UniProtKB/Swiss-Prot annotation:
Assembly description: Homooligomer. Interacts with PQBP1, UBQLN4 and USP7. Interacts with ANP32A. Interacts with CIC. Directly interacts with RBPJ; this interaction is disrupted in the presence of Notch intracellular domain. Interacts with ATXN1L; competes with ATXN1L for RBPJ-binding. Found in a complex with CIC and ATXN1L.
Localization: Cytoplasm; Nucleus
Name of this protein: Ataxin-1
Stretches with biased composition (Basic and acidic residues): 1-30
Main location: cytoplasm
Domain of life the protein comes from: Eukaryota
Misc. remarks from the entry: Different transgenic mouse, containing a poly-Gln region insertion in position 199 have been developed to replicate phenotypes of the spinocerebellar ataxia 1 disease (SCA1) in human. Heterozygous mice with a poly-Gln of 92 residues [92Q] develop the ataxia typical of human SCA1. However, they show only the phenotype associated with dysfunctional Purkinje cells and usually live a normal lifespan.
Family: Belongs to the ATXN1 family.
Ligase as UniProt keyword: no
Function summary: Chromatin-binding factor that repress Notch signaling in the absence of Notch intracellular domain by acting as a CBF1 corepressor. Binds to the HEY promoter and might assist, along with NCOR2, RBPJ-mediated repression. May be involved in RNA metabolism. In concert with CIC and ATXN1L, involved in brain development.
Chain positions with Phosphoserine modification: 81, 87, 213, 229, 751
Pfam families named in the record: ATXN-1_C, AXH
Lineage: Eukaryota, Metazoa, Chordata, Craniata, Vertebrata
Organism: Mus musculus (Mouse)
């Protein structure tokens, strides 16, 4: 006859039925009876193990079948329990009923291949601190990575095999980690802390680390502190975060954050395809070699090899310390992982905190309006005001990095389509056109002094990165900071380099490190390693008045449509262009005197222009190139010209005949364009007014109309002030003006018949000697006092 308990058990639904202890296999019996306090959990979880399906069905037909049907009804727990099974720990704790689990944990995708069931005994030090209502679900879903490798030999096998997990198995691990991470967002309490066994460490696998000796027995407490935004914030983490355990040495974390015998810290590292396996602490020598190897790989032509070291990640969250998050959306996510050596590397006298790199990026789930509101709300006063003048958006990254305070974030524009140096497109890091925050400043939490007197600084990457020191004005050069860090053995154990955006080839990367303080109350400080670029002055920046077409490789279009490089131009090109073109003619000027000007880098050249050899003196930069008949490009200072333009040229000397192509039908005559390269407009004018396009158009026989202000152009040409020394090649800019002719004045288009007649008459002289033209007296005088009229 059935007892009352059996009858009541049959009346219950299958999922709530209880299998008698006497009808279970012996292996389940031993596992289910560690203590009376876990009776409820044993009832909830043991029916879902594959052992029930394998043994219970044969030995106890009805009970096993009903238990299996109940297992199928538990849709939320089917894949999870089948993938990995854990026996309850021996430590007593409060456990909620099993019916609360479906509301807390979402199930993974059905049909996921599962790995064999392994039993792992949790150590007695594995405790749950925080809200009691969430303690139980943690126990059932602790992934194998958090289980002590020394607790059970079976667990060690699981840990060793975790490095070769398949994608399906990895999805289970990600699901478990998501459960742990999402639990922190269900309450506004100071966060839930999970204390794994002392030997537990999480790190990247695949050759990055080597297992070493276990840590000293004194290191008993370690935490994975899950600090996430409250559920009301509505922020959805697209990739599942995987907890990464940082080393909880007491010198690495502010003591104000310690809630137990040791400090707690967590890094949630979302890996889109990567996985983490537990490892034991490495030896001091191995850790030192690991750090050196990572530092060597960190910078490769200024690019971070992140994809190879940490996997191609799509999102990373760095949460350090206190979980005092407010119910506000967090618009930023930090995108880096901090690497810590083993505790053996830190002696009692070495209190330097660990240094890590942080890259804060906008959260794609946060609207742009909320982002702006966050930037305004979290705007800081001290270092931020320094950058507000330049229009940068500054603000805290949504209270994400709690231990790193105070800090300033620098937001710079970055094209979302531009590939980043980590090997992923920009859209893999942030969505749309929302620019990332790629600067980070670690400030002082207490009275902290930086070892070596390193100043705080901000680095704004870009085409010309800007380094802004903040505080400690005694040191101006950040390069000294890097030297101090690398040369000091105190910080040799924690080297780290961080490079953000792709920068020009000419940049020299000089990583700047914010060294943590030597004082005992050490805090975790983010080390900003950003490139400092030594920009090479281009010719346009060095002397803005010089035309860019003098640069080597510039393409010049001849009158016949042929394209030539500026360094390949020859005298025949000038002559041929003058013959073909209806608008252009060759003008020549003879150098009579070259003197240095009162201004540095400027030369005064006196030319004899035209048939009457009118004397015209012009101030010109020493590197300005002229085209000399039968010789090519020449300047007063060929070395300077070659340095700025990479244009090979000769030394300009007295007696050289400079030729240029000029317009025939200018109002007051044609201004001689000393530059054969660019067309009909005066080279000097181009240099001063930057009218290169117009001159090129005229040179290419485009009918843009004759410039009526050519006389002023000539004046401006003679007025050119180039801050260069004599000796640079200058293009023939000598301006020649032929007597004004009424027909030329009336007819402004190249098709005018009078212009054609003039062209024939002017082309009659032999090609070997260009026909000179006269400069009117008025034009000479209007060279703004810089021209000396010949007697």
């Amino acid at each position: 006859m059935k007892s009352n308990q059996e009858r009541s058990n049959e009346c219950l639904p299958p999922k709530k039925r209880e299998i008698p202890a006497t009808s279970r296999p012996s292996e389940e019996k031993a596992t289910a009876l560690p203590s009376d306090n876990h009776c409820v959990e044993g009832v909830a979880w043991l029916p879902s193990t594959p052992g029930i399906r394998g043994h219970g069905g044969g030995r106890h037909g009805s009970a096993g079948t009903s238990g299996e049907h109940g297992l199928q009804g538990m849709g939320l727990h089917k894949a999870l329990s089948a993938g990995l099974d854990y026996s309850p720990p021996s430590a007593p704790r409060s456990v909620p009923t099993a019916n609360t689990l479906p509301t807390v944990y979402p199930p993974p995708q059905s049909g996921t291949p599962v790995s064999p069931v392994q039993y792992a005994h949790l150590s007695h030090t594995f405790q749950f601190i925080g809200s009691s209502q969430y303690s139980g679900p943690y126990a059932g879903f602790i992934p194998s990575q958090l289980i002590s490798p020394s607790g059970n030999p079976v667990t060690s096998a699981v840990a060793s095999a975790a490095g070769a997990t398949t994608p399906s198995q990895r999805s289970q691990l990600e699901a478990y980690s998501t459960l742990l991470a999402n639990m922190g967002s269900l309450s506004q309490a100071p966060g839930h802390k999970v204390e794994p066994p002392p030997q537990q460490h999480l790190s990247r696998a695949a050759g990055l680390v080597n297992p070493g000796s276990p840590p000293p027995p004194t290191q008993q407490n370690q935490y994975i502190h899950i600090s996430s935004s409250p559920q009301s914030s509505g922020r959805a983490t697209s990739p599942p975060p995987i907890p990464v355990h940082l080393h909880p040495h007491q010198t690495m974390i502010p003591h104000t954050l310690t809630l137990g015998p040791s400090s707690q810290v967590v890094v949630q590292y979302s890996d889109a395809g990567g996985h983490f396996v537990p490892r034991e602490s490495t030896k001091k020598a191995e850790s030192s070699r690991l750090q050196q190897a990572m530092q060597a790989k960190e910078v490769l032509n200024g690019e971070m090899e992140k994809s190879r070291r940490y996997g191609a990640s799509s999102s990373v969250e760095l949460s350090l310390g206190k979980a005092s998050s407010k119910s506000v959306p967090h618009p930023y996510e930090s995108r880096h992982v901090v690497v810590h050596p083993s505790p053996a590397d830190y002696s009692s006298r070495d209190t330097s905190g660990v240094r890590g790199s942080v890259m804060v990026l906008p959260n794609s789930s946060t609207p742009s309006a909320d982002l702006e509101a966050q930037q305004t709300t979290h705007r800081e006063a001290s270092p931020s005001t320094l950058n507000d003048k330049s229009g940068l958006h500054l603000g805290k990254p949504g209270h994400r990095s709690y231990a790193l305070s105070p800090h300033t974030v620098i937001q710079t524009t970055h094209s979302a389509s531009e590939p980043l140096p980590v090997g992923l497109p920009a859209t893999a890091f942030y969505a749309g056109t929302q620019p990332p925050v790629i600067g980070y400043l670690s400030g002082q939490q207490q009275a902290i002094t930086y070892a070596g007197g390193l100043p705080q600084h901000l680095v704004i990457p870009g085409n010309q990165p800007l380094l802004i020191p903040v505080g400690s004005p005694d040191m101006d050069t950040p390069g000294a900071a890097s030297a101090i860090v690398t040369s000091s053995p105190q910080f040799a154990a924690v080297p780290h380099t961080f490079v953000t955006t792709a920068l020009p080839k000419s940049e020299n990367f000089n990583p700047e490190a914010l060294v943590t303080q030597a004082a005992y109350p050490a805090m975790v400080q983010a080390q900003i390693h950003l490139p400092v670029v030594q920009s090479v002055a281009s010719p346009t920046t060095a002397s803005p008045t010089l035309p860019p077409y003098f640069m080597k490789g510039s393409i010049i279009q001849l009158a016949n449509g042929e394209l030539k490089k500026v360094e390949d131009l020859k005298t025949e090109d000038f002559i041929q262009s003058a013959e073909i073109s209806n608008d252009l003619k060759i003008d020549s000027s003879t150098v009579e005197r070259i003197e240095e000007s009162h201004s540095p880098g400027v030369a005064v050249i006196q030319f004899a222009v035209g048939e009457h050899r009118a004397q015209v003196s012009v101030e010109v930069l020493v590197e300005y190139p002229f085209f000399v008949f039968g010789q090519g490009w020449s300047s007063c200072c060929p070395e300077r010209t070659s340095q700025l333009f990479d244009l090979p040229c000769s030394k300009l000397s007295v007696g050289d005949v400079c030729i240029s192509l000029t317009l025939k039908n200018l109002k007051n005559g044609s201004v001689k364009k000393g530059q054969p390269v660019d067309p009909a407009s005066v080279l000097l004018k181009q240099a001063k007014t930057d009218s290169l396009a117009g001159s090129r158009h005229r040179y290419a026989e485009q009918e843009n109309g004759i410039n009526q202000g050519s006389a002023q152009v000539l004046s401006e040409n003679g007025e050119l002030k180039f801050p260069e020394k004599i000796g640079l090649p200058a293009a023939p800019f000598l301006s020649k003006i032929e007597p004004s002719k009424p027909t030329a004045t009336r007819k402004r288009r190249w098709s005018a018949p009078e212009t054609r007649k003039l062209e024939k008459s002017e082309d009659e002289p032999p090609l070997t000697l260009p026909k000179p033209s006269l400069i009117p007296q008025e034009v000479k005088i209007c060279i703004e006092g810089r021209s000396n009229v010949g007697k």
